Regions:
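N-terminal cysteine/histidine-rich coordination modules
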Residues: 1-63
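A short, Lys/Arg-rich alpha-helix, primarily the initiator
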Residues: 59-79
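Helix-turn-helix DNA-binding elements, focusing on the entry/boundary residues of the two helices
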Residues: 75, 86, 97
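Alpha-helical residues within the helix-turn-helix
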Residues: 80, 91
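Short alpha-helical "recognition helix" segments of helix-turn-helix
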Residues: 87-90, 100
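Recognition helix of helix-turn-helix/homeodomain-like DNA-binding domains
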Residues: 94-110
Length: 175
């Protein structure tokens, strides 16, 4: 890529700067990503390899590593990565569309049971995508979650290198 997609001007290649991947709706930092900057029009691009694997790794990370109740942006990310509309997720979980909407916009906190169910659904989806019938990690993940969890106001950002989603998905859910 030598020319800007927007204006056709020469672009500057950036390889040593972390990329804040906020397009997914979460606070994710990708290291080792080639970025492009057009000084002429100000347009910025990033070259992110294998988005499907990246999103799967982020989803599995949320389900297995985040011990607090799911945050609104995490619920929305999981739903979108499941390729579900809010109406479809609501039907799957046995709640109303307005409940899913309130979870996703932060007006209502997701309950413990629905949090666990959404994580379970996502992990089974990730497992099916990896050609496994049942993901053994789901039960272990639920066992590791405390019965009562506190809300975390300021979570740490997730920092990832391409090797983590290109080569090293958890054994439970390789893509």
């Amino acid at each position: 890529m030598n020319k800007c997609y927007s204006c056709g001007g020469e672009i500057k290649v950036i390889k040593d700067k972390p990329y804040h991947y906020n397009e997914c709706g979460l606070d994710v930092v990708l290291c080792g990503i080639t970025q492009y900057d057009c000084p002429s029009c100000g347009e910025k691009y990033a070259s992110i390899p294998n988005m499907q694997k990246l999103h799967r790794l982020i989803g599995v990370y949320i389900c297995q590593k985040r011990k607090a109740l799911l945050k609104p942006e995490e619920i929305k990310f999981l739903r979108k990565d499941l390729h579900l509309k809010a109406k479809e997720l609501a039907a799957m979980l046995g709640v109303t569309v307005s409940t899913v909407s309130r979870w996703e916009n932060g007006k209502k906190e997701i309950g413990e049971a629905y949090d666990r169910l959404l994580r379970s659904v996502y992990m089974m989806y990730a497992s099916e995508q990896a050609n496994h019938m049942i993901c053994g990690g789901v039960l272990n993940m639920f066992k590791e979650l405390p019965a009562k969890r506190k809300k975390i106001e300021h979570s740490k950002e997730l920092v990832l290198n391409p090797q983590e989603w290109l080569n090293c998905l958890p054994e439970c859910c390789p893509v």
